Amino acid sequence: MASQGTKRSYEQMETGGERQNATEIRASVGRMVGGIGRFYIQMCTELKLSDYEGRLIQNSITIERMVLSAFDERRNKYLEEHPSAGKDPKKTGGPIYRRRDGKWIRELILYDKEEIRRIWRQANNGEDATAGLTHLMIWHSNLNDATYQRTRALVRTGMDPRMCSLMQGSTLPRRSGAAGAAVKGVGTMVMELIRMIKRGINDRNFWRGENGRLTRIAYERMCNILKGKFQTAAQRAMMDQVRESRNPGNAEIEDLIFLARSALILRGSVAHKSCLPACVYGLAVASGYDFEREGYSLVGIDPFRLLQNSQVFSLVRPNENPAHKSQLVWMACHSAAFEDLRVSSFIRGTRVVPRGQLSTRGVQIASNENMETMDSSTLELRSRYWAIRTRSGGNTNQQRASAGQISVQPTFSVQRNLPFERATIMAAFTGNTEGRTSDMRTEIIRMMENARPEDVSFQGRGVFELSDEKATNPIVPSFDMSNEGSYFFGDNAEEYDN
């Protein structure tokens, strides 16, 4: 599949394009985010939002969710066939927050999905612009990754909660396409496959008949996506075994969990993209910026530059720390939930703290929360430096994969060591190396044992000044090697519940 010389850049996946050169890619990504911006401006006009209200991230999220819901064909069809009390399948809406007499009030709005689709298409030159929708999904997914923990989901599928760094993109909808698949972590793919296998074990007809044939195709496709994320021959060979299994069952689940654990050290390649809230693109378009003409990239300086001069606000609950709220959104914007805090802090220019120390809850406000006491503050989304986003796991060289901390999946291509607790990880690999995958298992364990925490990843890669848009002078930071930085240590975040 992906390895047969058909690798496309993320931007091509993101824009659904075939092979393009760099300029064409920049233009089509620019067209995509420009369309999001135009749509947002139009929605603000429809809803009569003031400039301040239009810059409120909660309003942006509501508007984004409305357009995603309007284009969710599968769910729309389901809602029409299974009418539930009090849900109009043809309408979509959510909370819009307005400033009235020095207070914030919540207003629930309802719109025809058809109308939302019309506004979206009109903003995107009459096209469906699926790429823009996927982009919004990835932004929501990145926000969830930074906000919630998935301990319960991990435990339910028989995985270890310490594998949280493999769970990027775990809340992405199935319909997020190639761009969505690129940003999913190894753990996310493993979890989707395990759920599928478990259904097959419990439901005899799952793999049978015409439906079963389609299920099987989906299963093999997911296996191939996961295989493409692994960078060592032994891990890939094990994925072939899982994919070719006649009747996937507990043996395959075992193999998948083994592979997920191995990815803590032999890291998979997972793409990272800076996807920003719709209001940010809206602000830029409103100020006369032409994204398509200027070109745009999700993995270079552009998102940093955009955030340098965008002012976005957020509602803040009475006992929340606005600086912490800003950190949460900054991490989401740069897809940095699983990045080493030392690297994030250096790039951001202010200390990024582990989630257990944040005094803030999620960005979205529940419908039963009291608005009387809500305040709003400016989100500080600027950075000191910028760095290129990576799609590799940071293994030091292709075959002999390097050290991986029990909870880092690098976002930025910046030189550092990837400290990890080998004892903690290796403890999970006691015993079981028999069965048909025994030689691969042995090989994988051997590679893991040879990994050294002091090895340097992304050799020679550095961060850049914001004035250095051509990335000519890398500044290679030096980090305190002993002090590893996981965002998830001492975690007390809420669970993600759909």
Curated annotation (Swiss-Prot):
Post-translational modification as stated in the protein's UniProt record = Late in virus-infected cells, may be cleaved from a 56-kDa protein to a 53-kDa protein by a cellular caspase. This cleavage might be a marker for the onset of apoptosis in infected cells or have a specific function in virus host interaction.
- Where the record places motif Unconventional nuclear localization signal is 1-18
Q: Name one GO biological process term.
A: symbiont entry into host cell
InterPro entries this protein is in? Flu_NP
Q: Where in the cell is it found?
A: Virion; Host nucleus
One cellular component (GO) term of this entry: ribonucleoprotein complex
Q: Where is this region: Disordered?
A: 1-21
Q: Which residues form the signal peptide?
A: none
Q: What is its main location?
A: virion
What family is it from? Belongs to the influenza viruses nucleoprotein family.
- Subunit structure comment from the entry: Homomultimerizes to form the nucleocapsid. May bind host exportin-1/XPO1. Binds to viral genomic RNA. Protein-RNA contacts are mediated by a combination of electrostatic interactions between positively charged residues and the phosphate backbone and planar interactions between aromatic side chains and bases.
The name this protein carries in UniProt is: Nucleoprotein
Record the organism.
Answer: Influenza A virus (strain A/Turkey/Wisconsin/1/1966 H9N2)
For this protein's source organism, the top of the classification is: Viruses, Riboviria, Orthornavirae, Negarnaviricota, Polyploviricotina
Its encoding gene is what?
Answer: NP
